[in-house]
């Protein structure tokens, strides 16, 4: 809700029509119409839609979790009932976005807990639901959303330095994961 409230005046200023709480049932690309589960339809010029997230079929086939998601302790990041099995990223059933940043912050907690379990026999950190998301707003401007289980997104006014930070961060990230930095 916080993001939708924040984005509405920005979209209006840029002449972008949007609709929230619209669950896509089907897209008719020939007539450029999208129909909802709720029985409404909307014409479009450019449709930007996020497909439903789906869990892994192998998880469901092996009885590890409903819908393909592994039941995960939201703080320990372990499979429910198995404290020696860590779960990260898109495989979890956590109430956080399935994004690279969420997986990154989860992985940091898991790595520290594996190391501390080896060294002192117990995990030392809990995951707080932290997610960081850049939001490009056009015209070389950007902002970000950072939130966790306790704090909703607190979006700032878009600005050019944030756009360039995002651009630089992406280049640095991919350079580092390829081992070039």
Where are these regions (language model features)?
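C-terminal auxiliary extensions adjacent to catalytic cores
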Residues: 144-181
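Hydrophobic residues embedded in beta-strands of well-ordered beta-sheets
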Residues: 32-34, 86, 142
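A structural signal for short hydrophobic beta-strand segments in well-ordered beta-sheet cores
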Residues: 24-27, 77, 135
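FAD-site-proximal beta/loop scaffold in flavoenzymes
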Residues: 41-108, 112-116
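A Rossmann-like FAD-binding core segment of flavoenzymes
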Residues: 1-69
């Amino acid at each position: 809700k916080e993001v939708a409230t924040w984005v509405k005046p920005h979209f209006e200023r840029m002449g972008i029509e949007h609709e929230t709480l619209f669950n896509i049932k089907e897209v008719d690309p020939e007539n450029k119409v999208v129909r909802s589960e709720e029985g409404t339809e909307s014409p479009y010029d450019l449709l930007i839609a996020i497909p439903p997230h789906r869990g892994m079929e192998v998880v469901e086939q092996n009885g590890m979790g409903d819908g393909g998601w592994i039941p995960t302790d939201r703080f320990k990041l372990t499979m429910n009932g198995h404290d020696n099995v860590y779960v990260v990223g898109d495989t979890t059933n956590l109430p956080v976005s399935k994004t690279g940043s969420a997986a990154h912050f989860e992985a940091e907690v898991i790595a520290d807990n594996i190391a501390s379990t080896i060294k002192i026999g117990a995990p030392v950190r809990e995951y707080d639901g932290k997610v960081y998301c850049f939001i490009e707003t056009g015209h070389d401007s950007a902002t970000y959303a950072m939130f966790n289980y306790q704090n909703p997104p607190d979006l700032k006014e878009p600005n050019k330095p944030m756009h360039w930070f995002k651009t630089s961060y992406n280049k640095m990230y991919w350079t580092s994961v390829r081992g070039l930095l």
